[in-house]
Amino acid sequence: NDTVHDFTKDPIETYIDGYWVKAKGTTLGADNGLGVAAIMAVLEDNSLKHGPLEALITKDEETGMYGAFGLKPGTLKGEILLNLDSEDEGELYIGCAGGIDLTATLEYKEEAPAADLVARKVTLKGLRGGHSGLEINQGRGNANKLLARVVHDVLIEFDSQLASFEGGNMRNAIPREACAVLVFNPEDTEGLEDYIKEYEAQINAEYAPIESGITLTIESVDLPAAIVPAEIQDNMISVLMACQDGVMRMIPTVPDTVETSSNLAIVIIGEGKAEVRILARSSCDTMKEFLADSLTACFAMAGMKVELSGGYSGWQPNVDSPILHAMKLSYQQQFGVEPAVKVIHAGLECGIIGANCPGLDMISFGPTLRSPHSPDERALI
């Protein structure tokens, strides 16, 4: 914030710190300025011997991949695509996940609670969260899933009613926190408090050592003016319990790599409306469609209206890719070690470009970068 810089005209001030190239007070722009620089270097070097080349430089990759979406079929003449947007030297990427957003909504008529009831707010915190693609396979807890389970059991054990439920705030992040307001008989107060305390210990035991420090607290709040009708309450908690969350399938041909997953990202219930948002991912487009259909059916059974949006294609890995074998051989000859072959469970432009230009043999690689999109960004020399 203390750096005055006009990115439309001011040059990036770079310097070398040990083995790293850094920028003074701004982002370095190596993601993906280094890729563009590499393309320009090849194009201007007349001493290099190679066949016909095309240079594809897209816009807005970080904010929505709009350039890749705008690529028309038939624009590219080449049959091989070298994507330069990966961030670890020595790694070759041969696949990525596509995604689709699911939003389920329901409007309902609120009811007034009996005046002699009391209310408590139950809050679940302390989860690690993380990226819903890259870290979905870590076994971390989802706050929306866990709190739905808690509320489900409380509704069975105690004569209680749901007033509101809220958790998560980003579709591509595993939710770390969630809270619910419950209404019940005053004589059950001590029993409910003890139950919540025991539940906290149970959840921590289940998720140790992946999660450490999950808290489940209960606090007194004013009696709300409205609660969720019993039938709607039961349907909503049931669908949150039943819907797919986490890893659904691994890639058969690439060990220890997620193919298909979903993230129960955002839940808001209250004030006469329920809304659930899920991000589904898969490197296999047909599996992504199957997951979206399965989730749609699940929420439809709860009486919710479902809308799918923001879909983009995945890049299904081909372990027999000719460019993969050529790149592996070239890397071994140059550096004496075999490169790592990976699939990323997140979006790359390759998925979109491959859908617009079928038949491309694609691979993604690049230099080692750290802390992109921040003033701490650096590129390894």
Task: Please give the residue ranges for each predicted region.
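Zn-dependent metallopeptidase/amidohydrolase metal-coordination segment
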Residues: 252, 259-274, 335-381
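Hard-cation-handling environments
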Residues: 195-259, 263-271
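His/Asp/Glu-rich mid-to-C-terminal helical/loop segments that flank catalytic regions of hydrolases
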Residues: 74, 139-157, 186-189, 232-241, ...
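A short beta-alpha structural unit
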Residues: 170, 180-181, 215-227, 265-267, ...
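Short amphipathic alpha-helices in soluble, non-transmembrane regions
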Residues: 190-204, 290-299
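Active-site metal-coordination/substrate-binding segment of hydrolases
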Residues: 1-52, 57, 61-63, 68-70, ...
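Active-site-adjacent substrate-binding region
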Residues: 142-165, 317-360
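Fold-level recognition of mixed alpha/beta catalytic cores in primary-metabolism enzymes, strongest
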Residues: 53-143, 151, 155
